[in-house]
């Protein structure tokens, strides 16, 4: 017999869980978590777009660096999406939802040089890194704040690496 059931709350529907975080805290935390999931889905896709399409000086170094970034972004995305579900929410990670809700500007498909890609990536990594850092203090759930802190450390490092390669 399944113990999963929907529990009506004031602002949303949560899936039953024995996690005793306050329902209002769960609901607001899930909104913040999903905001970051959406940003990370977009950032992972953008990173791969740049990885595939750049050419020029320092190509191989940046190409390989971006693979590592994308792997880490996907790991954080997975952890954050799973936290949504742990709190009784539904993780919003589809391309359709991401397209509708991402704060990131559309990534240009008409750039080719390593430098142009690095500049475009720096703008987008900066937005996500700053938003994740802001989310740490927005949430009232310590476990979620800890998850965001881990992601923030990596995103700040990745932004630093990208900016350090811009000539």
Swiss-Prot record:
Entry-linked SUPFAM superfamilies: Ferritin-like (SSF47240)
The keyword Iron is assigned to this record: yes
Parts of the chain that traverse the membrane: none
Catalytic activity: 2 Fe(2+) + H2O2 + 2 H(+) = 2 Fe(3+) + 2 H2O
CDD domains on file: DPS
Listed InterPro entries: DPS_DNA-bd, DPS_DNA-bd_CS, Dps_gammaproteobac, Ferritin-like, Ferritin-like_SF, Ferritin_DPS_dom
Function comment: During stationary phase, binds the chromosome non-specifically, forming a highly ordered and stable dps-DNA co-crystal within which chromosomal DNA is condensed and protected from diverse damages. It protects DNA from oxidative damage by sequestering intracellular Fe(2+) ion and storing it in the form of Fe(3+) oxyhydroxide mineral, which can be released after reduction. One hydrogen peroxide oxidizes two Fe(2+) ions, which prevents hydroxyl radical production by the Fenton reaction.
Family that this chain belongs to: Belongs to the Dps family.
Protein name per the record: DNA protection during starvation protein
Organism whose genome encodes this protein: Sodalis glossinidius (strain morsitans)
